[in-house]
């Protein structure tokens, strides 16, 4: 009976003490250059981590029409990076290429500058 009680206590302790990954609140300011594309109707961003996803665009705000767009996204994540792709007029960039990997800075906010469909900023 004593062994059963000890086994039960140990099992209970193992079940209630789990490894929980530390989460971080990280904000990324995405700045996207779209020139020379003309007649832009909508610009968005898709990605791995909430609030982004790969099925729908998060809209980016126009800074300069047909040229410069911006979005600020806050992630609550256990990772130190995220992956994204930009979308212009329903066209996803970097087809058949890796996603953009954004490494979060040590501070709370990361500024990420990009040029649409180019791996060179």
Question: What does each model-identified segment do?
Answer:
Residues 1-7:
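Bacterial N-terminal signal peptides that target proteins for export
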Residues 9-13:
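Hydrophobic helical h-region of N-terminal Sec-dependent signal peptides
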Residues 16-18:
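C-terminal motif of bacterial Sec signal peptides marking the signal peptidase cleavage site
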Residues 20-22:
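Bacterial signal peptide processing site
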Residues 26-34:
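A short, amphipathic beta-strand motif
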Residues 36-79, 89-107:
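Aromatic-rich carbohydrate-binding modules that target alpha-glucans
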Residues 80-84:
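Exposed beta-strand face motif in extracellular beta-rich ectodomains
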Residues 101-121:
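Extracellular beta-sheet/turn segments enriched in Thr/Pro/Gly and aliphatic residues
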């Amino acid at each position: 009976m004593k062994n059963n009680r000890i086994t039960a206590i140990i099992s209970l302790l193992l079940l209630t003490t789990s490894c929980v990954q530390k989460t971080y609140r990280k904000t990324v300011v995405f700045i996207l250059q779209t020139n020379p594309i003309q007649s832009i109707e909508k610009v968005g961003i898709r990605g791995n981590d909430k609030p982004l996803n790969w099925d729908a665009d998060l809209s980016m705000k126009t800074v300069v029409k047909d040229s410069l767009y911006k979005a600020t996204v806050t992630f609550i994540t256990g990772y130190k990076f995220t992956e994204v792709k930009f979308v212009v007029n329903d066209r996803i960039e970097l087809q058949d290429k890796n996603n953009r990997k954004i490494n979060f800075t040590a501070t709370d906010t990361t500024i990420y500058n990009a040029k649409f469909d180019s791996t060179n900023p």
